């Protein structure tokens, strides 16, 4: 792609490190649900990250429910290792014949991640998030391209991300709009255009694949990981402009 019109970025794991926030909120929620269901166990942060990267979940409520169900019925580490890339929560529900339900996951997860004024200090994990991106690069990208964001966060959580970065994240699609990998998330933001989408999971790649198949637009996907960090990707884009 010679000159993309849009640069679209995921937020969690790309712009913001979530190891001590979302990852930990999933862990604590899964373990609390297991206790309520009479199961004694623990889950590693590595297992959570591997599971999220492989599956087609859209938000961490679904990640949490999937891990809760899997751990009740199977060896969790083996389950995640063998989990088919791109599969959904429904695959686990069908396999186990059970479900937990968002209505049981969300109150626990939100209290841990968002916190409450009357909560113990362990809650409000969003405060532990750290920027991964040099926000001056976002400003430079916005001068050269159209810049937007697609995230599994809610609008409330998006505002918290802006606080963490001390940078306004405008032109954003949140989970109230569409869940990835629904291509309408990208269409809603860019229409049918050319661009680059940077994310850190297989689900992000599926979003781009679905968009290219179902619209006249053309997007390339860039996987962000420790060997290909977002700051380097943005610098390379600016150098090529």
Where are these predicted regions, by residue range?
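Active-site neighborhood of HAD-like aspartate-dependent phosphohydrolases
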Residues: 1-49, 62-65
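Generic macromolecular interface patches on structured domains
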Residues: 35-40, 74, 168, 218
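Solvent-exposed amphipathic alpha-helical surface segments
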Residues: 33-37, 71, 75, 237-241
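Flexible, glycine- and charge-enriched loops at secondary-structure boundaries
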Residues: 19, 57, 179
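A metal-dependent, Asp-based hydrolase signature
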Residues: 52-146
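Asp-based, Mg2+/Mn2+-dependent phosphohydrolase catalytic module
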Residues: 1-7, 126, 133-141, 148-150, ...
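Short alpha-helical scaffold segments that flank and stabilize functional sites
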Residues: 28-32, 67, 71, 164, ...
């Amino acid at each position: 792609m010679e000159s993309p019109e849009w640069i679209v970025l995921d937020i969690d794991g790309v712009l913001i490190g979530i190891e001590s926030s979302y990852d930990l909120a999933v862990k604590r929620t899964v373990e609390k649900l297991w206790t309520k269901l009479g199961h004694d166990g623990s889950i590693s942060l590595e297992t959570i990250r591997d599971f999220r990267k492989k599956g087609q979940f859209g938000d961490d409520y679904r990640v949490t429910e999937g891990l809760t169900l899997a751990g009740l019925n199977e060896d969790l580490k083996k389950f995640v290792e063998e989990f088919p890339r791109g599969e959904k929560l429904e695959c686990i529900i069908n396999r186990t014949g059970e479900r937990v339900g968002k209505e049981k996951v969300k109150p626990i997860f939100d209290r841990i991640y968002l916190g409450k004024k009357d909560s113990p200090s362990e809650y409000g994990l969003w405060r532990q998030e750290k920027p991964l991106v040099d926000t001056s690069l976002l400003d430079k990208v916005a001068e050269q391209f159209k810049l937007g964001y697609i995230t599994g966060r809610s609008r409330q959580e998006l505002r918290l991300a802006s606080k963490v970065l001390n940078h306004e994240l405008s032109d954003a699609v949140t989970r109230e709009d569409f869940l990835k990998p629904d291509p309408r998330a990208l269409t809603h933001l860019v229409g049918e255009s050319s661009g680059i989408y940077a994310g850190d999971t297989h689900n992000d790649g599926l979003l781009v694949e679905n968009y290219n198949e179902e619209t006249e637009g053309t997007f390339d996907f860039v996987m962000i990981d420790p060997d290909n960090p977002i700051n380097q990707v943005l610098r390379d884009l600016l150098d090529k402009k």
